[in-house]
Amino acid sequence: MHLKTILLTRPSGANKSLADLFRADGLSPIVRPLIELAEKPVDLEMKRIALNLDHYDKIIFVSKSSVRFGLPILENYWPQWPISLEWLSVGPGTAEALKQLGVVASFPDLAGSEGLLALEGLQEVAGKQILIVRGVGGRELLGQSLGESGASVTYLE
C-alpha cells in the first residue's frame, strides 16, 4: 500500500500536531517549514493604533502568532485594558494563548473566520470600531465581511 504524502510548510514548531492528525488518517506528512515568523518593528501607525485602543469596540486576534507579536505592542501603552473592549479570537488555541497572558476572549465552536463571523456578537456591527490583529498581509475575509456589515475595521499587523 502506498501512503499519500502531504507537505506541511507551517513555521518550525507548528507542524507536529497537524502531522500527527494526518498520520492518524493514514497520510504521510513531510515537514518542511517554509515560513518564518518575525517580529515587525513598531512603526508610527502601529503606535497610533495602540494608543487609541480605547476607541475600539471589539478586538479580534486571528492566530496564536498575532497574540505573540501583537499583544505586547498593545501592553506597552495599556497597563490596564479598556473595560468596554470585547475580546475575540478565531478559535480555542488563540483564546488559550490570550488567556495565558491574562485576557479572556470569546471564540466560536467552529474555529476560523467563518465560525467567528457567525458569533452573535458579530451579527450587528454597523457603526462599531473593530481592531483585527494579524500578520502582515493576512486573509481579508473577516475584515471585508465586517466592513460590508457597516463596521469600521482597522488592522494591527
Describe each model-derived feature in a short phrase.
Residues 1-157:
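Signature of uroporphyrinogen-III synthase
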